[in-house]
Amino acid sequence: MTKIGGILVCLVIVGLDVAAAILGIQAEVAQNQVKHMRLWLFECREPSQDAFRLGLGAAAILVMAHVLLNLVGGCLCICSQDEFQRSSSTRQISMACLVLTWIVFAVGFGSIVIGTMSNSKSRSSCGFTHHHFLSIGGILCFLHALFCVAYYVSATAAKDEAK
């Protein structure tokens, strides 16, 4: 029963991350369909309400996936480098995956938020181009799914190993 629960948790997290990735990429497509004028590095364009909504949805779903992972993955506390070096390889892999998950989440979430905010109604302006933030955030959602599964599997194995 535990294996079925673990598989279900992984599928839900991957499903949420894939949904966030698809929404982020669709937001990029919607953003590119808006009229804009470009002169070298500067660009003037109208914000896309569709891109704003899709980006907001992608950010919310990515946060849900990350929170779910941290709730079900548990906490494997390693407080010092000595403790890290003395811990088992499974626990070290788990901690590395957790750190990578947080890094990918921070960069992906930040990219999606930057892309989403550039499509806010109040942001109809000219300036430096900010292309591909939404699609980069979407791609990082796929990477987030990969590290989430790796963390969950290794954290579960480390907990079983400790028993």
Curated annotation (Swiss-Prot):
It holds the Pfam family DUF1218. One of its GO terms (biological process) is leaf development. It is found in: Endoplasmic reticulum membrane. Expressed in vascular cells, mostly in hypocotyls, and, to a lower extent, in seedlings, roots, flowers, siliques, developing leaves and inflorescences, but barely in mature leaves and seeds. High levels in leaf primordia. It comes from Arabidopsis thaliana. Keywords: Developmental protein, Endoplasmic reticulum, Membrane, Signal, Transmembrane, Transmembrane helix. Interacts with OPS. This is Protein VASCULATURE COMPLEXITY AND CONNECTIVITY. Disruption phenotype: Defects in vein connectivity early in mutant embryo development leading to reduced complexity of cotyledon vein networks and disconnected veins, including in embryos provasculatures. The mutant deal1-1 exhibits a bilateral symmetry breaking but no obvious defects in dorsoventrality; early leaf primordia fail to acquire bilateral symmetry and instead form ectopic lobes and sinuses. Developmental defects of pistils, some being bent or coiled or twisted, and some showing unfused carpels with exposed ovules. Required, together with OPS, for embryo provasculature development and cotyledon vascular complexity and connectivity. Necessary, partially redundantly with DEAL2 and DEAL3, to ensure bilateral symmetry development and early leaf margin patterning, probably via the regulation of auxin and CUC2 distribution. Regulates cell proliferation but not cell expansion. The lineage of its organism: Eukaryota, Viridiplantae, Streptophyta, Embryophyta, Tracheophyta. It is a multi-pass membrane protein. Coiled coil: none annotated. The chain crosses the membrane at residues 54-74, 95-115, 133-153. Belongs to the DESIGUAL family. Residues 1-27 form the signal peptide. Its main location: endoplasmic reticulum. GO terms for cellular component: endoplasmic reticulum membrane. InterPro entries: DEAL/Modifying_wall_lignin1/2, DESIGUAL.
